[in-house]
Amino acid sequence: MADIIARLREDGIQKRVIQEGRGELPDFQDGTKATFHYRTLHSDDEGTVLDDSRARGKPMELIIGKKFKLPVWETIVCTMREGEIAQFLCDIKHVVLYPLVAKSLRNIAVGKDPLEGQRHCCGVAQMREHSSLGHADLDALQQNPQPLIFHMEMLKVESPGTYQQDPWAMTDEEKAKAVPLIHQEGNRLYREGHVKEAAAKYYDAIACLKNLQMKEQPGSPEWIQLDQQITPLLLNYCQCKLVVEEYYEVLDHCSSILNKYDDNVKAYFKRGKAHAAVWNAQEAQADFAKVLELDPALAPVVSRELRALEARIRQKDEEDKARFRGIFSH
């Protein structure tokens, strides 16, 4: 450990171990996944916190050898054992890019595209983007770089091949190969009744394809091919959302599909069920009518859904009448 700390110090990194880790130091070969919590602090007397992964509720996951935009994190992570807590004071040369990396991580934490604002910008927009990161603290740090302290807690170290990569960590080739496997895993989870977990798998597969699609010209054969792969996954995702009664999300996604593919029977059927669930009776009937028009063989299924809708409407009418009678009887 003394040798490691000495080498870090020569490179402008001061390590202070707060809690010793468990076992031997992993070899951290390329492809190793490190999961850790981090807190970034100013190195001045106040020690103001810039970012804290615990406050966001999810630890950081770093794949060694993937050329992460902040190389110093890979350097310091590779000196840690599982369970270790340590602080690293890093010279300016190591943290110049931190504001840009922090912006991407903050975007990810709130569900935004990590590259938001960095692609397809006109000249004026790019100038504005370069002048501001959208966060006052990051703007100040970018304009006046200073050493930073990283407080790190190593939660888990996984060797290559022992874990499934998150979509954001994959190469384009890895994403394309992973989609069918993630799709199958989602189907298995759904069959076993793990609906929320299945939805998460479908979401991951969609994220992979969306990321690939963003690199293609909209409307091009490649873009359309990817979109046609996304559609069945999105329908599976909608089925999960129907089961967990998140109907408005189903309405949004099915409508987006039908705006592009107005002959998609499954999208009409799922949207019809969602409309029925939120008492949009006319819209539900219209969608079910469209299902029959496109595929008359589904008449028994549609009839069952319409009977269920009519029964719910009658029950609701009776409940409303009883409620009003109660109001006016006082």
Swiss-Prot record:
Variant or mutagenesis effect after changing R271W: In PITA1; uncertain significance
TPR repeats mapped onto the chain: 179-212, 231-264, 265-298
Entry's Gene Ontology BP terms: protein maturation; protein targeting to mitochondrion; xenobiotic metabolic process
GO cellular component, one term: cytoplasm
Keyword tags: Cushing syndrome, Cytoplasm, Phosphoprotein, Repeat, TPR repeat
Subcellular location(s) of the protein: Cytoplasm
Residues annotated as domain PPIase FKBP-type: 31-121
Outcome (variant: R304Q): In PITA1; ACTH-secreting pituitary adenoma
Tissue specificity as recorded in UniProt: Widely expressed. Higher levels seen in the heart, placenta and skeletal muscle. Not expressed in the liver.
Phosphoserine PTM positions: S43
GO molecular function: aryl hydrocarbon receptor binding; GAF domain binding; peptidyl-prolyl cis-trans isomerase activity; transcription coactivator activity; unfolded protein binding
Highest taxon in the source lineage: Eukaryota
Related illness: Pituitary adenoma 1, multiple types: A form of pituitary adenoma, a neoplasm of the pituitary gland and one of the most common neuroendocrine tumors. Pituitary adenomas are clinically classified as functional and non-functional tumors, and manifest with a variety of features, including local invasion of surrounding structures and excessive hormone secretion.
Function: May play a positive role in AHR-mediated (aromatic hydrocarbon receptor) signaling, possibly by influencing its receptivity for ligand and/or its nuclear targeting. Cellular negative regulator of the hepatitis B virus (HBV) X protein.
Subunit structure: Interacts with RET in the pituitary gland; this interaction prevents the formation of the AIP-survivin complex.
Protein name: AH receptor-interacting protein
Native source species: Homo sapiens
Lineage: Eukaryota, Metazoa, Chordata, Craniata, Vertebrata
Gene behind this protein: AIP
